[in-house]
C-alpha cells in the first residue's frame, strides 16, 4: 500500500444503496464517506440487476464519479489512488460493465479492482489473529427478507 498515489477508496454496491469508505494512511483509520447532503449511504441509480445493462452506463459513471468526489472531500482533497469495489453478484456481465465505467472515468486497470462480498469478508476474517478463525469462519449475510449462512 505504500506505493498508492492517493487514498484507498472502498465502494460496496448493494441492492439499493452503496456505501463507501477511505483508508487514511496518515491516521491508519477507515473513514466513512458521506454523500453530498451528509447522508450515510448513496442511493443507487438503479437496482443491482441494472449493473451490466448498457443503457445504464452513463448513470453508473455519474454515480461512481460522485462517490469518488465525496471520498476525495472526506480525504481533505486528496485524490483516489486505488479503488476496490465489492458486489454481491459476481457475473462477467457486471464485471465488464464496471470495467467500462472505470475506463470512462479514466482509471487504469491497476488503480481499481472488483471483489465479491464473500471475498471481502474472507479477506477481513483471515487477516485477523489466527486464534479468532482457527475453529472456522461463518458468513451471515442478511437483509429484511432473508438470511444466508456460509461456512468458510
Report residues per predicted region.
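Nucleotide/phosphate-binding catalytic cleft detector across ATP-hydrolyzing
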Residues: 1-15, 19-20, 25-29, 51-138
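Short acidic-glycine loop/turn motifs at beta-strand connectors
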Residues: 22-27, 40-46, 152
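Short, compositionally biased "basic patch" segments
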Residues: 35-53
Amino acid at each position: 500500500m505504500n506505493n498508492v498515489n492517493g487514498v484507498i477508496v472502498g465502494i460496496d454496491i448493494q441492492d439499493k444503496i452503496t456505501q463507501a469508505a477511505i483508508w487514511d494512511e496518515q491516521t491508519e483509520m477507515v473513514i466513512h464517506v458521506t454523500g453530498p447532503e451528509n447522508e450515510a449511504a448513496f442511493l443507487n441509480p438503479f437496482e443491482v440487476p441494472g449493473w451490466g445493462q448498457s443503457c445504464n452506463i452513463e448513470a453508473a459513471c455519474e454515480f461512481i464519479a460522485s462517490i469518488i468526489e465525496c471520498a476525495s472531500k472526506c480525504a481533505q482533497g486528496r485524490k483516489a489512488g486505488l479503488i476496490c469495489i465489492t458486489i454481491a453478484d459476481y457475473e462477467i456481465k457486471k464485471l465488464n460493465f464496471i470495467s467500462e465505467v472505470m475506463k470512462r472515468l479514466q482509471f487504469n486497470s491497476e488503480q481499481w479492482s472488483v471483489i465479491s462480498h464473500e471475498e471481502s469478508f474472507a479477506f477481513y476474517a483471515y487477516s485477523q489473529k489466527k486464534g479468532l478463525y482457527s475453529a472456522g469462519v461463518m458468513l451471515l449475510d442478511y437483509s429484511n427478507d432473508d438470511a444466508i449462512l456460509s461456512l468458510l
